[in-house]
Curated annotation (Swiss-Prot):
Kelch repeat placement: 132-178, 179-225, 229-269
Residue span, F-box domain: 20-66
The protein, known as: F-box/kelch-repeat protein At4g39580
Pfam family membership, one: F-box
Lineage: superkingdom: Eukaryota
Amino acid sequence: MNEEEAPSEQKKTLSLVPSPTTNLFLPDDILLSSLSRISRLYYPTFSLVSKSFRSLIASPELYQTRSILGRTESCLYVSLRLLNDSNLRWYTLCRVPDRKLTNFSGGHLLVPILSRYAPPAHWSSVVAVDYNIYAIGGPINDAPSSSVSVLDCQCEKWREAPSMRVARNYPTATVLDGKIYVAGGCEDCTSLDCIEVFDPKTQTWDSVASPGTERCERLVYKSVGIEGKYHLFGGAGHVAYDPKEGRWDSVGMDMEMGRTWVSYCVINNILFYYNDREFKWYDYKGRFWRKLMGLERLIKFLCYSRVNLAAYGEKMAVLWDTFVPSSSKNKMIWCAEITIERHDIYEICGKTEWFDVVLRVPKSYELVHVLAATV
């Protein structure tokens, strides 16, 4: 939709039921070849055709074919939590094949994933590596946890991965060069495993050299992976780890944002964040934050909302919920897709491709995680 006007809040109807003329008798190899060439965003709709289609869409053969054909793409996943419920509801963004079927002008919806089971990962740190989403640490049942749960986004089923070496509360996890770095939340800050790294290929955990006991003792707020370095932000400042050299360096306070980072993401080695009605990006050369231009109209719709950012391929996904009066029973989850355009070394602009309501939920639901997996 045009970002100058919001869609009507009237009740919107949707029919995703496929045409009864759909041919269900094609050989599986032809169906696989055809489905592999279609955007993954349409798969939730095709899964409604029949059990046979549902099985094909969750089959490893389909995703092997997509990979061979170079058809993998970024797919957005979102978790919501009902008040006083530790379990999460997971959704994925899909496209409606025929926009005439819906009054949602953007043609996008959040639909539940196939798996009904989801680990209690409200306070876990969640990251994606390829087509797997990892929910790491706790608290779970009010206690630190070393558990790691994995959502396979191809078949949309959860499984358990090897546990961390130490249990953690509120850890921060970051993906760098295909490995997952985890810090914070451990009770013994002098432990050699205060910071750990997980290799999804070997399914093993290893310790990372500590930046110092003082830095580990102070609360770690955030972490990011940029230009081959693992950055930690916390009460003791900002430090960066170079895995190739095995060395920590103090970066200083110029980039430090601590708890004020409401939401952030890294796209093409550029750090973006949203807070206090502003989108900003970090200029490494000038060593200060610059305003992300071009999103002034979108910001008007973000007031009084909890905003989540996610790297969505080379684009940015922005999700937020609407402020609702006490008399309302439901609220709306919105999504915007932003193209990032660099005009010169000093200016980056965002262009809103579309934004729309993608889900309507009871107002007691909370938007928790937003991230993209490559499927």
